[in-house]
């Protein structure tokens, strides 16, 4: 009898899950895996696209976070996930804002009590018992403070969730039955995929107000030799990812052909058909000629489950 695979994605704000891992999430839910997404803040400090949402922002009604709960719920539904999970509960920690911005509100995620935040995620891991956990790399992708802190909290929680209670140094201080996560991945962007995606775009894929970003904007990309795994989107999975991005209407605009999108800065991003990963902990399974796994579950004993 096969065991249902369980995957857990941990992100900082609503929309991060769709931008970084939308294809991967839809890939596994469409094959019967149990996938959950933990979001650490409501993205209250985010910029919005267009005048329609302007009154929601922090300088006006400060209701953007509440609205983004709706957006995230719709995006996850498009990806096949039943409902969002919020670290500590919805609104427990607030979006910290971009690096260099003045702290305007208390309870910023980057100021969260470490023991409380790690403990909240340990409790989720021990309850869900995921075979795979995914979050950002140590730089938080492009470096948003909440992304960096999400990496730190997730790495600590993955390490702590498998520690049994006892008197020894490092013994368990969190409730729940220990669960050692078999595989822990960082979600990363491949330079080769960015370049291929940008080169494939045509005028019909773009909106008039969009601009082409210089390559230096993608300074956080990874070379192929540093990547361990890839998940490739089928047409159905691609459609699910595009629908999820469209659901985040305050943050993302999808282009006319569904091949590209842009955030509030109007810089074009390809909607990637491949999503790439670095294996941070655990044992790799079979690799292809590039040296990449093509299944995040590779090497795990889940008899009878087909993730292809």
UniProtKB/Swiss-Prot annotation:
GO BP annotation list: mycothiol biosynthetic process
Catalytic activity line of the entry: 1D-myo-inositol 2-acetamido-2-deoxy-alpha-D-glucopyranoside + H2O = 1D-myo-inositol 2-amino-2-deoxy-alpha-D-glucopyranoside + acetate
This enzyme's EC code(s): 3.5.1.103
Binding site for Zn(2+): 13, 16, 147
Cofactor: Zn(2+)
The entry's keywords: Hydrolase, Metal-binding, Zinc
InterPro entries: GlcNAc_PI_deacetylase-related, LmbE-like_dom_sf, Mycothiol_biosynthesis_MshB
One GO molecular-function entry: N-acetylglucosaminylinositol deacetylase activity
Taxonomy, superkingdom: Bacteria
Cofactor note: Binds 1 zinc ion per subunit.
Similarity comment text for this entry: Belongs to the MshB deacetylase family.
Purpose: Catalyzes the deacetylation of 1D-myo-inositol 2-acetamido-2-deoxy-alpha-D-glucopyranoside (GlcNAc-Ins) in the mycothiol biosynthesis pathway.
Name of the featured protein: 1D-myo-inositol 2-acetamido-2-deoxy-alpha-D-glucopyranoside deacetylase
Organism, scientific name: Mycobacterium leprae (strain TN)
Gene encoding the protein: mshB
């Amino acid at each position: 009898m096969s065991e249902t695979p369980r995957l857990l994605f941990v992100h900082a704000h609503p929309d991060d899950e769709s931008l970084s891992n939308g294809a991967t999430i839809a890939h596994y839910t469409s094959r019967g895996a149990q996938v959950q997404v933990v979001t650490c803040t409501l993205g209250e400090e985010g910029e919005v696209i267009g005048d329609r949402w302007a009154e929601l922002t922090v300088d006006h009604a400060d209701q953007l976070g509440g609205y983004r709960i709706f957006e995230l719920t719709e995006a996850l539904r498009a990806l096949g996930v039943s409902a969002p999970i919020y670290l500590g509960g919805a609104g427990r920690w607030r979006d910290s804002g971009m690096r260099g911005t003045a702290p305007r509100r208390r309870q910023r995620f980057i100021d969260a009590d470490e023991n409380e935040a790690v403990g909240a995620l340990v409790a989720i891991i021990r309850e869900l018992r995921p075979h795979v956990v995914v979050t950002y790399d140590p730089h938080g992708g492009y470096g948003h403070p909440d992304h960096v802190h999400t990496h730190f909290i997730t790495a600590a929680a993955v390490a702590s969730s498998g520690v049994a209670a006892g008197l020894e140094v490092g013994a368990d201080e969190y409730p729940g039955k220990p669960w050692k996560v078999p595989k822990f991945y960082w979600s990363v962007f491949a330079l080769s995929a960015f370049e291929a995606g940008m080169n494939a775009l045509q005028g019909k894929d773009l909106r008039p107000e969009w601009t082409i970003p210089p390559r230096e904007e993608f300074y956080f990309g990874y070379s192929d030799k540093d990547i361990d795994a890839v998940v490739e989107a089928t047409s159905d999975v691609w459609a699910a990812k595009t629908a999820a991005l469209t659901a985040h209407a305050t943050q993302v605009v999808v282009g006319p052909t569904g091949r590209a999108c842009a955030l509030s800065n109007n810089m074009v991003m390809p909607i990637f058909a491949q999503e790439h990963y670095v294996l941070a902990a655990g044992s790799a399974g079979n690799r292809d000629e590039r040296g990449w796994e093509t299944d995040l579950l590779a090497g795990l004993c889940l008899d009878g489950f087909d993730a292809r």
